[in-house]
């Protein structure tokens, strides 16, 4: 797990344990070494500075302890797949996320 300028908000009292499973959408196989990036989001939808970056293990799994309750932006990036990004409301002691990454779309051009 890599911390990126962890804001003070990460140390709030109500905290959750997050589990991630990153899979290939086309065959359901795990994605190893994918970056799972976590950013807090304020009530106006603005992303806070700092955050955390996790890496998935060979089984496509990653976890994080100590996420404060509130809105969280989760992004998953890895070469060869479309970037996943979505906001989630963290409001329970434990959350599990199954993220299915899609292959990149074909690029279309008018130039030859």
List the predicted regions and their residue ranges.
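Short strand-edge motifs at loop-to-beta-strand transitions and within beta-strands
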Residues: 52, 62, 86, 95-97
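Short, acidic Ser/Thr/Gly-rich low-complexity loop/linker segments typical of extracellular
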Residues: 43-61
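Beta-strand-rich domain onsets/edges
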Residues: 2-18, 23-25, 29, 96-112
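Hydrophobic loop/turn residues within beta-sheet-rich immunoglobulin-like superfamily modules
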Residues: 67, 91-93, 102
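Surface-exposed loops/turns
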Residues: 58, 68-69
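Short, ordered, surface-exposed loop/turn motifs in non-cytosolic proteins
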Residues: 16, 26-44
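Extracellular Ig-like/FN3 beta-sandwich strand-entry sites
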Residues: 15, 69-71, 81, 94
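A short, solvent-exposed loop/turn motif at the edges and junctions
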Residues: 71, 75-88
């Amino acid at each position: 797990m890599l911390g990126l300028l962890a804001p003070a908000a990460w140390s709030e009292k109500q905290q959750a344990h997050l589990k991630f499973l990153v899979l290939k959408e086309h065959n359901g196989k795990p994605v190893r070494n994918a970056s799972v990036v976590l950013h807090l989001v304020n009530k106006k939808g603005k992303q806070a500075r700092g955050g955390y970056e996790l890496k998935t293990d060979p089984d496509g799994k990653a976890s994080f302890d100590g996420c404060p309750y509130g809105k969280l932006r989760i992004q998953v990036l890895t070469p060869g797949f479309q970037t996943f990004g979505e906001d989630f409301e963290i409001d329970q002691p434990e959350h599990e996320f199954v993220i299915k990454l899609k292959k990149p779309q074909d690029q279309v051009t008018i130039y030859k």
